[in-house]
């Protein structure tokens, strides 16, 4: 599948802008969301090819948003890559159990983010 549209989800404006710049500079169309609820709405409306999502967010965390995306027939095939400061082995296992396809630890490099896009091309 060719990745063209990317949804970035983070409640930290600094992290959201940083990810957006990395991905947009590589030539991809980037949409953003600041919460799990907003991510679900945008994913349903815009059908991104991949989602980069923070885990620790207010009201709905990334795990819950990922579970809901995976239960929806319209969004269940969109790969979710968690981008988070939670980087223990248990965090990686839990992320996978919630339906995440990968986990990138903060702080990250542009290459680590773009490598994840390449994995799903």
Which residue ranges define each predicted feature?
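Short hydrophobic/Thr-rich beta-strand motif most characteristic of the beta2 strand and flanking loop
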Residues: 27-34, 42
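Active-site beta3 strand of CheY-like receiver
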Residues: 46-52
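Charged docking surfaces used in two-component/phosphorelay signaling
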Residues: 17-25
């Amino acid at each position: 599948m060719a990745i063209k549209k990317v949804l970035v989800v983070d409640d930290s404006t600094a992290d959201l802008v940083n990810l957006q710049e990395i991905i947009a500079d590589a030539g991809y169309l980037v949409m953003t969301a600041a919460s799990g609820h907003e991510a679900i709405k945008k994913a349903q409306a815009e059908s991104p090819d991949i989602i980069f999502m923070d885990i620790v967010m207010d009201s709905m965390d990334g795990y819950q948003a990922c579970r809901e995306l995976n239960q929806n027939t319209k969004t269940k095939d969109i790969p979710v890559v968690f981008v988070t400061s939670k980087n223990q082995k248990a965090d990686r296992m839990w992320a996978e159990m919630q339906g995440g396809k990968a986990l990138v630890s903060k702080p990250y490099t542009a290459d680590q983010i773009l490598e994840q896009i390449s994995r799903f091309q």
